[in-house]
Amino acid sequence: MTSNSEPRTDRFPVSAVVLAGGRATRMGGADKGWVELAGRPLIDHVLDRLRPQVDEILINANRSQARYQALAPVIGDDNPDYLGPLAGMQAGLAAARHDWVLFVPCDGPALPRDLMSRFRAALTPATELVVAHDGDWLQPVVALLHKSLLPSLTRALAEGERKIDIWFARHQMAVVSFADQPDAFINLNSPDELAAYEARLPDSATGQGATS
């Protein structure tokens, strides 16, 4: 019999949901997925990082849905009032084909290429969710959740909960450090942050090479 503390070693299928449903107020209201970095939309960089790691990709979006649909199936929040990332996670858990669902933001062009392999290594039979840590801070919108959490999340939203970390703390959570990849979860929440990050890229870094 497997102990609840022993890591899982099986290669199970994973769905991924790119969270693109926010208002992006610090980006001047622009749809962040379509803001360009090195000549390509941020969403393209994110999808490049995700495709080799997962078995299904969905995009959670509340606007530009037809445009996103050209890249992957689109799901909107159940509530139209922009309730935050937890609402996107609820929609993703409900729509995903597989039991484990990876969530990432649409403005994460440097997501780790070994994100899922490290998350898998952290799982035990008791684990309900896995969250990334950058060495200084928890990164709650980069997380692997089991679909069995959907009823709990639906209740939390109905009760007015909007804070991811508070809801996460109610469940069996594993935390995985990516301190060795300092840019993995770079914040690109404003035009200034985007420009500063792009300025650090090599002069030749365009297209897919920008996040290689």
Regions found by a protein language model. Give the residues of each.
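Intrinsic disorder/low-complexity segments
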Residues: 1-8
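Long, low-complexity, intrinsically disordered segments
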Residues: 205-212
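Nucleotide and nucleotide-moiety/phosphate-recognizing core
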Residues: 8-161, 166-185, 191-205
